[in-house]
Curated annotation (Swiss-Prot):
Name by which UniProt lists this protein: Delta(6)-protoilludene synthase HYPSUDRAFT_138665
Residues spanning the membrane: none
Record field: catalytic activity: (2E,6E)-farnesyl diphosphate = Delta(6)-protoilludene + diphosphate
Binding locations of Mg(2+) 2: D79
InterPro entries per UniProt: Isoprenoid_synthase_dom_sf (IPR008949), Terpene_cyclase-like_2 (IPR034686)
Length: 327
């Protein structure tokens, strides 16, 4: 469905406190400071951002060790370029990225889009640590991510807004959680029989959906102000039900609560496989829970979505924005 004409008003909206009962608490990787500095310098060396975007980017904080930081930075490079690209350009960029990841030893052209070299260097470093299973799953997940980014560009070029069910199908890949989870299992040897177990698959999908909701709640103001909110669940819900942004936020907050309860209930059903594998399974599942908290903390503590008011807004939950109601 294409967006209809809109009327603009200024309003204060309340961000739902979606993680009020989430048991995983905020914590920082002990190697974070050193990894963040090295990874930020690496990313800046590609000159992939405009000066204004680079200044904003440098204010952001990233969770995890060096490989995790590099992946987040690679996501930012991809977002910076594909968010304004046509479907055709996004496909070309996606192909460059995947060629670099599938064959990182192949020299990249100096005239090639910068994302190729960034992906190559990231993956060459990551493969030094990745187990074979994590290596394979990351490549598969990143292909799905890039394909979905191309689909997002196609939707944007047509001013097309999906319904809720169709949106989740695409967003589960554009959110970038699947390749991120593959990095979480970088040192783990989890066979397909584990990852394809119904409980593990359900926990993974529930976690992704919870992250989508948290991300879309926090990113909506910035995306809306830049006229790029078509790929956001708030817009999707507003468009489908003809309701206000606050009503849409409340709707998806209720959905978030239901999904979070399902995740915690499903957690009780984590299977046992025997021996050391059980510890690796628990490590992966705790990584899912931690990722939800990390995404929320980063959304407020970085300056990407709320500028210098992030911590204040995390407490008050109040944001002022210029609302365009698609009714």
């Amino acid at each position: 469905m294409a967006l209809s004409n809109s009327n603009s008003t200024t309003a204060t909206v309340t961000l739902p406190d979606t993680l009020r009962f989430w048991p995983w608490q905020r914590h920082i990787n002990p190697h974070y400071s050193a990894c963040k500095k090295a990874s930020s310098e690496w990313c800046e060396s590609f000159k992939a951002f405009s000066p204004q975007a680079q200044r904003a980017f440098n204010k952001c904080d990233f969770n995890g060790c060096r490989i995790g930081c590099d992946l987040m930075n690679l996501f930012f490079i991809i977002d910076e370029h594909t968010d304004i690209a046509s479907a055709e350009t996004a496909r070309t960029q996606a192909n460059i990225i995947m060629e670099a990841i599938r064959d990182p030893e192949m020299p990249r052209s100096e005239n090639e889009w910068v994302g190729g070299k960034a992906a190559q260097q990231f993956w060459l470093n990551a493969t030094k640590s990745a187990t074979p299973s994590a290596h394979r799953r990351f490549i598969d997940a990143f292909q799905m991510y890039m394909d979905a980014v191309v689909q997002q560009a196609a939707d944007r070029s047509k001013n097309y807004v999906r319904d809720i069910d169709d949106y989740f199908v695409v967003r589960r890949d554009t959110i970038g959680a699947k390749p991120s989870f593959a990095i979480c299992e970088l040192y783990l040897n989890l066979p397909d029989s584990v990852m394809e177990h119904p409980v593990i698959m359900k926990l993974t999908e529930l976690c992704i959906d919870v992250i989508i909701i948290g991300n879309d709640l926090c990113s909506y103001k910035v995306e809306h102000e830049h006229g790029d909110d078509g790929h956001n669940l708030i817009t999707v819900v507003m468009n489908q039900f003809k309701i206000t942004p606050q009503e849409a936020m409340n709707y998806i907050s209720d959905l978030h609560d239901k999904l979070a309860v399902q995740f915690l209930d499903e957690w009780k059903n984590i299977p046992t496989f025997g021996g050391p594998l059980d510890l690796e399974v628990r490590t992966y599942c705790h990584g899912l829970g931690n990722w939800v908290r990390a995404n929320d903390s980063w959304s407020f503590e970085s300056e990407r979505y709320f500028g210098k008011r992030g911590i204040e807004i995390q407490t008050t939950r109040q944001i002022e924005m210029n609302i365009q109601s698609h009714l």
